[in-house]
UniProtKB/Swiss-Prot annotation:
Gene3D superfamilies: Glutamine Phosphoribosylpyrophosphate, subunit 1, domain 1. It comes from the Eukaryota. GO terms for biological process: proteasomal protein catabolic process; ubiquitin-dependent protein catabolic process. The 26S proteasome consists of a 20S proteasome core and two 19S regulatory subunits. The 20S proteasome core is composed of 28 subunits that are arranged in four stacked rings, resulting in a barrel-shaped structure. The two end rings are each formed by seven alpha subunits, and the two central rings are each formed by seven beta subunits. The catalytic chamber with the active sites is on the inside of the barrel. This is Proteasome subunit alpha type-3. SMART domains: Proteasome_A_N (SM00948). It is found in: Cytoplasm; Nucleus.
Amino acid sequence: SIGTGYDLSSTTFSPDGRVFQVEYAAKAVDNSGTALGLRVKDGVVLAVEKLLVSKMLVPNTNRRIHTVDRHCGLAMSGLVADGRQLVSRGRAEATSYREFYGTDISGKVLNERLSNFVQLYSLYGSVRPFGTSVILGCVDKNGPQLYMIEPSGISWGYFGVAIGKGARAAKTEIEKLKLSEMTAREAIKEAAKIIYSVHDDAKDKAFELELSWVCEETGNLHKFVPKDLLEEAEKYAKQALEEEEDMSEEED
């Protein structure tokens, strides 16, 4: 069906019930740096492999992880500008909820409102779908919450999730973890290890690891991981990779 005209508009279904423009938007995510979220017993950890296109970039700029509300973080994969639009919308929703109800927005409600907003952009010929998937991590009165929203507007709740070019390999690694027994501090190291292990050195040379957490240790506020902890996690990740490489060489 591709190339027969059914892929010209996001308002057109193909004969087999597919909307190609939405599928193409998902391809933008599949070609982007990996992002993942881990929901553990005391909070949520978000990690992103931010691919660096130039050595001239200032460190810690063009972030892929943002704070949507004081207790909620958002990690994105795909087109960064589209992701920023969702961050702005998320912040507006969180602010209006607090003004109206006098309390913080729950992860479930924020996820519903954002996914409805994303889905609207697949209904009209005058707009295009968002070329980004986002992972929402919150801690509210119901405990840690983790959601992922796709360009189609579909969203699910997760214990662990990955998006981007290394998503499949990352999911395999996430499934090996005992997330319900893990603390956020431990999860930071594992998240760093997974991002380093799925990074493709052959295709993408340089990348910057972004890590954030919202947990009991941060007072249930979304914050970027402190520099010393980030460096410790990166060291752990590199050591673990070297050990795995040594073991595979010995087996050969």
